Amino acid sequence: MRIGIDLGGTKTEVIALGDAGEQLYRHRLPTPRDDYRQTIETIATLVDMAEQATGQRGTVGMGIPGSISPYTGVVKNANSTWLNGQPFDKDLSARLQREVRLANDANCLAVSEAVDGAAAGAQTVFAVIIGTGCGAGVAFNGRAHIGGNGTAGEWGHNPLPWMDEDELRYREEVPCYCGKQGCIETFISGTGFAMDYRRLSGHALKGSEIIRLVEESDPVAELALRRYELRLAKSLAHVVNILDPDVIVLGGGMSNVDRLYQTVGQLIKQFVFGGECETPVRKAKHGDSSGVRGAAWLWPQE
């Protein structure tokens, strides 16, 4: 049995999968924000609940909104900031009395979709989480690729490519929380989409409300979405030029905008070197379960 844990900002979730990937158990508990030791205890409780419910002992994989530095062995770049600077995998392994495999939550999405999701069987998968922020992960042959520095997939903190004059102005107006300017995340996260609509219309709306206006043929909402589609396509074309994945998978709140799957693939061709690109852009099959399923699959079938 494989147990996966997904640590989110508000909830921590466990899933137990059987040998064929079937769900045996799933449960959520509130994430104890700003309390490192209680976070470990919450995870231990969830693992115990899964094992009690199934009557089996499982391997444990963990997805977090950050990564482990290969140089210091502690968590870095986590927006769950109380994890930063902590040897989280070692402390969790000691508490659970077994090895715990840990990966960035976007890498878990990539693994999940590569194993039995929208990119099942693909050799190279690039998976994107587009929600409040913007992260990405890479899977090779169903296994997470973290890179030599532990930063593979940190796509959202590269500059938006091929900026037009308006985007150059926006870059100066809205710096990224990472301290740099012009990051992809500031443009194509759900937050960035809503902010661009506000710049165009003068009204603050949620992403879902803007999409509803698009469906009602509102011209300003339509313009905001077209700008978003082009920015997403430019950003993904950079990935194709460097990595050339077999499949691109979208997860997170913006992945529910169905029109993206008709438009973005064609727009990518305008920016890929040589103009040829048939890389499919697909919606995550497992939805909000992908991260926790991918954490479980950090222990692959041998």
UniProtKB/Swiss-Prot annotation:
GO MF entry, a single one: ATP binding
Enzyme Commission number(s) of this protein: 2.7.1.4
Name the record gives this protein: Fructokinase
InterPro entries: ATPase_NBD, ROK, ROK_cs
Keywords for this protein: ATP-binding, Carbohydrate metabolism, Kinase, Nucleotide-binding, Transferase
Keyword Nucleotide-binding (UniProt): yes
A single cellular component GO annotation: cytosol
Residues holding ATP: 4-11, 133-140
Top-level taxon: Bacteria
Membrane spanning stretches: none
Keyword Nucleotide-binding in annotation: yes
Reactions mediated catalytically: D-fructose + ATP = D-fructose 6-phosphate + ADP + H(+)
A matching Pfam family: ROK
Enzyme class per UniProt: transferase
Chain's role: Catalyzes the phosphorylation of fructose to fructose-6-P. Also has low level glucokinase activity in vitro. Is not able to phosphorylate D-ribose, D-mannitol, D-sorbitol, inositol, and L-threonine.
Assigned protein family: Belongs to the ROK (NagC/XylR) family.
